[in-house]
């Protein structure tokens, strides 16, 4: 019947399912397991996109090649040199000394310091009652005037500046009195500008400063050094240095500085007790050997 056929089919189906479950639980053989692992590895590698790495080969070294030679660098200041010592300790910092390279003009005692020059400039501006822009024009005129007339501490009166055909006069008193240590040392700050100015004037026409004319300087190429506040430095040519020294020696030759001037109190305080009569020869002579003349 239909029910009996259905009952007979069910056990057959169950038997088939049990058989398939047993096949799943049955362990795989060794070769099959290795093959499966290999296939899984290939699939994983394909999915990740990685490629097998190969070892980097070292470059071949030529037996006849030589290495590089390094030139030894000597120390600029050797620590073995004899240094000033206090309590067996050096009092110099060599690391700072190697880097300390100041401009020789800034540490020269032949020119005014920056503080002294600033004080001189401000005092002149105050006494002339001008602003900074006007002071710059006056400094141009003062520099050119000093090129021609020098910077002697004995100068007095007025210095002049020309505006077209008009001549303007300015007192020298604030310039000389406020210059510390001296006017020449203050004017040495203008040395490079004065040298360039003389060179510029010579481009238009022959120009020799009065300082060079008085010293009878014949070489026109040395005109740029012919002013008394020129500052000699390491770049000064030998001929220019010699010419400047000769002009300076000629300018100060025969000049003497007296520490003391003539005392104004020259009267004598002694009392003259001599008595003279009208018959005396003179005020200081009574007679010659007792005879009247």
UniProtKB/Swiss-Prot annotation:
Entry keyword Acetylation: yes
Compositionally biased intervals (Low complexity): 31-40
Naturally occurring in which organism (per UniProt): Nigerian sorghum potyvirus (Dawa mosaic virus)
Entry protein name: Genome polyprotein
Any one of the GO CC terms: viral capsid
Post-translational modifications: Genome polyprotein of potyviruses undergoes post-translational proteolytic processing by the main proteinase NIa-pro resulting in the production of at least ten individual proteins. The P1 proteinase and the HC-pro cleave only their respective C-termini autocatalytically. 6K1 is essential for proper proteolytic separation of P3 from CI.
Keywords: Acetylation, Capsid protein, Virion
Positions of transmembrane segments: none
Ranges for region Disordered: 1-64
Keyword match Acetylation: yes
């Amino acid at each position: 019947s239909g029910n009996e056929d259905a009952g007979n089919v069910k056990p057959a189906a169950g038997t088939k399912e049990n058989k398939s479950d047993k096949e799943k639980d049955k362990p795989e053989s060794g070769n099959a397991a290795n093959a499966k692992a290999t296939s899984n590895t290939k699939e994983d590698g394909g999915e990740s996109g990685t490629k097998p790495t190969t070892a980097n080969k070292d470059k071949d070294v030529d037996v006849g090649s030589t290495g590089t030679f390094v030139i030894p660098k000597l120390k600029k200041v050797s620590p073995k040199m004899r240094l000033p010592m206090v309590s067996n300790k050096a009092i110099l910092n060599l690391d700072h000394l190697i880097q300390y390279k100041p401009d020789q003009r800034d540490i020269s005692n032949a020119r005014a310091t920056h503080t002294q020059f600033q004080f001189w400039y401000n005092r002149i501006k105050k006494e002339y009652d001008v602003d900074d822009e006007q002071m710059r024009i006056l400094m141009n005129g003062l520099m050119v005037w000093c090129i021609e007339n020098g910077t002697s501490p004995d100068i007095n009166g007025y210095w002049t500046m020309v505006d077209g055909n008009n001549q303007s006069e300015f007192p020298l008193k604030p310039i000389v009195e406020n210059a510390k240590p001296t006017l020449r040392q203050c004017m040495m700050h203008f040395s490079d500008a004065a040298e360039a100015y003389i060179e510029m004037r010579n481009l238009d026409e022959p120009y020799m400063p009065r300082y060079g004319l008085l010293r009878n300087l014949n070489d026109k190429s040395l005109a740029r050094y012919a002013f008394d506040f020129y500052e000699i430095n390491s770049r000064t040519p030998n001929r220019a240095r010699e010419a400047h020294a000769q002009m300076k020696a000629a300018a100060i030759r025969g000049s003497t500085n007296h520490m003391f001037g003539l005392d104004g109190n020259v009267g004598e305080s002694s009392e003259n007790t001599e008595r003279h009569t009208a018959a005396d020869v003179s005020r200081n002579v009574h007679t010659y050997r007792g005879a009247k003349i």
